[in-house]
Amino acid sequence: MYKMEYSYLNSSAYESCMAGMDTSSLASAYADFSSCSQASGFQYNPIRTTFGATSGCPSLTPGSCSLGTLRDHQSSPYAAVPYKLFTDHGGLNEKRKQRRIRTTFTSAQLKELERVFAETHYPDIYTREELALKIDLTEARVQVWFQNRRAKFRKQERAAAAAAAAAKNGSSGKKSDSSRDDESKEAKSTDPDSTGGPGPNPNPTPSCGANGGGGGGPSPAGAPGAAGPGGPGGEPGKGGAAAAAAAAAAAAAAAAAAAAGGLAAAGGPGQGWAPGPGPITSIPDSLGGPFASVLSSLQRPNGAKAALVKSSMF
């Protein structure tokens, strides 16, 4: 067992020390302690009893027994604790608020970076280190620049694709609108006019008056140079060119008159067929040329046969 060799803890010396102390100062310093006089009620039996009455602590006097001397013997429990443990959180907040200064690239650096980016979008570590050494930057800054540049490139590609799709949709919409307009115009042109009169007859009425003389038309018998069967028209080459021209004009006039008469008898154009041809009474004798023999053969008493032959010829 350890022996306590603190001589000032002797009962007589302790009582004399406590009697000489100013308890008011002790109470004011430590408010939680009621009074130091309570310690006098405890009896301390020292292990060593070799101290005599004259062997008390001569250095402990009422003047020297004070709060300071007792406090010196107490060891501070926070002596080994570092100072930074009890610092406030203001320093941590300041460190969090401190951000890295934004890197500002020069035009020469950007030019060199863009040149390498045009060659490859994903440079390896050796290329990045060489480029960083060349343009006086760190490899980390070069790597971050390439990451941002790739993101910008992808964004530009998406914007270009969206613009191309919008332009394509706009052109297709315009084409469809123009085709619809053309179709509507064609539909309007093909629709008949509901407010107008009857349209033209798709099957025009054939005019039979020119071939054999229509009903009501003048007969070519009265034409100059015409003659009966016994007249002088039997000689084919006698009229000459003037007579042939006059006969042709007379025949044209007769055909026009016959056509007009046929239309009048039918009640207007497109209302019905013209009446059948009337019998041919006579044919001008002055018509010469290669058809003279045919025309002379038509001058026969049988009018029905002559009309049939002439209608088949024309």
From Swiss-Prot:
Biased composition range(s): Low complexity: 162-173
GO molecular function, one term: RNA polymerase II transcription regulatory region sequence-specific DNA binding
Function per UniProt: Involved in the development of several major noradrenergic neuron populations, including the locus coeruleus. Transcription factor which could determine a neurotransmitter phenotype in vertebrates. Enhances second-messenger-mediated activation of the dopamine beta-hydrolase and c-fos promoters, and of several enhancers including cAMP-response element and serum-response element.
Organism (species): Homo sapiens (Human)
Keyword DNA-binding carried by entry: yes
Compositional bias segments (type: Gly residues): 210-240, 264-275
Biased composition (Basic and acidic residues): 174-191
Protein name as catalogued: Paired mesoderm homeobox protein 2B
Subcellular location: Nucleus
Portion annotated as DNA-binding: 98-157
Coiled-coil positions: none
